[in-house]
């Protein structure tokens, strides 16, 4: 399929105060827009929108993707990570790998049609990916939306990652599982503050999972 547009920041480069609008694919089989920060690059104080897939095709088009790796930092940027527009399609994603850090950035993962935007951290045995002092809000649809079958936004801490001193809120809403934060093998909540919002009548509360050796 067709490749999406791509931005690459390397070797101490910074996005400064830019506005980055990364679009999800709207053609079946295509990739969404991508931005990559590597080798101590920083997102600066930019405003970044990471859109989910815009095409109605199960498992086909992809959402937009932002990747941080090799000591890259999200700086003080603001990220809006959207869910999919149609059932089973790809969501917007932001991922931190190796020794990258979310630093002082703010993230809002939003619910989609049936899957919300995704934020993930995964390091290696020699380098931990961390959330730094980030502010993370995993969103969920409100009861008024009438949606009862979708997943809210989510943050995942996978192998060799840590929430550090981040502030994380998992919103309540009428979704299948609510907004959620997940810790899996060899990850740690460390000194983070996590709030799981309580649901009103008909709502699902926010959820935090600790699995395996987390």
Language-model-detected regions and their locations in the chain:
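Beta-strand-rich extracellular passenger or scaffold domains
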Residues: 1-214
């Amino acid at each position: 399929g067709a490749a999406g547009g791509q931005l690459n920041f390397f070797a101490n480069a910074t996005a400064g105060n830019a506005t980055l609008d990364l679009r999800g694919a709207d053609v079946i089989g295509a990739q969404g827009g991508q931005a990559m920060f590597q080798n101590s690059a920083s997102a600066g104080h930019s405003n970044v929108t990471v859109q989910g897939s815009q095409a109605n095709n199960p498992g086909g088009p992809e959402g937009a993707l932002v990747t941080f790796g090799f000591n890259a930092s999200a700086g003080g940027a603001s990220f809006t990570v959207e869910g999919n527009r149609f059932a089973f399609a790809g969501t917007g994603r932001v991922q931190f790998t190796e020794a990258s850090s979310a630093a002082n950035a703010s993230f809002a993962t939003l619910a989609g049609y049936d899957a919300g935007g995704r934020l993930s951290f995964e390091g290696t045995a020699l380098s931990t990916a961390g959330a730094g002092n980030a502010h993370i809000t995993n969103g969920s649809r409100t009861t008024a939306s009438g949606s009862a079958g979708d997943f809210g936004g989510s943050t995942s801490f996978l192998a060799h990652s840590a929430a550090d001193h981040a502030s994380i809120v998992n919103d309540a809403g009428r979704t299948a599982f609510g907004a959620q934060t997940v810790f899996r093998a060899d990850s740690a909540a460390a000194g983070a503050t996590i709030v799981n919002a309580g649901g009103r009548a008909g709502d699902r509360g926010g959820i935090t999972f600790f699995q395996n050796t987390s």
